């Protein structure tokens, strides 16, 4: 299950950040951007996250996922569109196949909420191998 490896990577990054902060006793929530084209099922990720958090500083933490829609731009005519699922990667205007993906592959931690109430923005690179 791909989502389990993603959940473990998120937990590892948050645990490292918590260790660097020094005084964190519990993590309350993790906010994660998940692109529509990232190949991750948010419900499966939440399930895996809950299981993998057991016995860590993240035990009981909420995983809040924000879906980022897939968008593309046609190189020849500059038309932008939502690619949807399954992705439509040919231009609806001119039929061109030279497109740039503008969004939808994101898989990154946006913020972490510690028990002390402070919110810390992500300072690390996205965990996704799909850039």
Swiss-Prot record:
> Does Protein transport show up as a keyword for this record?
no
The organism's superkingdom is given as Bacteria
**What residues bind Zn(2+), as annotated?**
74, 77, 91, 94
Among InterPro entries, the record links this protein to: HypA/HybF (IPR000688)
Positions annotated to bind Ni(2+): 2
Gene Ontology terms, MF aspect = nickel cation binding; zinc ion binding
Q: Does Zinc count among this protein's keywords?
A: yes
Keywords (A to Z) from UniProt: Metal-binding, Nickel, Zinc
GO process terms (BP): protein maturation; protein modification process
**UniProt cross-references to Pfam families, sorted A to Z:** HypA (PF01155)
The entry's function note states: Involved in the maturation of [NiFe] hydrogenases. Required for nickel insertion into the metal center of the hydrogenase.
Give the similarity note: Belongs to the HypA/HybF family.
The molecule here is called: Hydrogenase maturation factor HypA
The organism encoding this protein is Streptomyces avermitilis (strain ATCC 31267 / DSM 46492 / JCM 5070 / NBRC 14893 / NCIMB 12804 / NRRL 8165 / MA-4680)
